[in-house]
């Protein structure tokens, strides 16, 4: 808490922070709710589109499962009591985000109508979801120019891994 308060009140050109500490800095509850509602709306639209196509029953079931998971996250967020003494990511005044070792965030869920495609993750890592939400916020305040990802690890598994990294940016 003290470290985040110093970042928020200080006049720093750069702050270097480890991944584990970065993940502990939450987005505001309101922003998390709005982003989850956007994701639920997107998947609802995709479900309706898949229902209109014939032979997409498996895909619809998978997307319904994802929608249920997102709704559970939203309900959990709504049930949480808010701590007033927590400095949120928005309050830090960050205007540029450089992420080293960005390959650690490759497990971001991707819902799609395609089936049996190698590398499409059916699970979602919390740290990846957190980074995705923070990147969406950075896109809002910088016009899509506030994020830089760096890694020395080559794309190894599939094109979906590259697509996932590009979704952040």
Where are these predicted regions, by residue range?
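SF2 helicase/translocase NTPase motor core
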Residues: 1-137, 158
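Conserved helicase ATPase motor motifs in RecA-like P-loop NTPase domains
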Residues: 103, 142-158
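A short helix-turn-beta junction within AAA+ P-loop NTPase domains corresponding to the substrate/partner-engaging
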Residues: 162-169
């Amino acid at each position: 808490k003290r470290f985040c308060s110093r970042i928020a009140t200080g006049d720093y050109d750069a702050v270097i922070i480890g991944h584990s500490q970065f993940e502990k800095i939450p987005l505001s509850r309101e922003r998390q709710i709005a982003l989850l509602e956007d994701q639920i709306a997107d998947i609802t639209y995709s479900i309706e589109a898949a229902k209109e196509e014939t032979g997409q029953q498996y895909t619809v079931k998978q997307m319904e499962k994802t929608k249920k998971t997102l709704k559970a996250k939203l309900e959990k967020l709504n049930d949480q009591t808010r701590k007033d003494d927590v400095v949120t990511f928005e309050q830090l005044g960050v205007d540029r985000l450089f992420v080293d070792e960005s390959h650690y965030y490759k497990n971001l869920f991707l819902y799609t109508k395609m089936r049996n495609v190698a590398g499409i993750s059916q699970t979602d890592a919390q740290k990846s979801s957190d980074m995705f939400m923070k990147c969406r916020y950075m896109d809002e305040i910088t016009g899509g120019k506030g994020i830089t990802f760096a890694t020395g690890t080559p794309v190894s598994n599939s094109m979906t891994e590259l697509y996932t990294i590009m979704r952040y940016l």
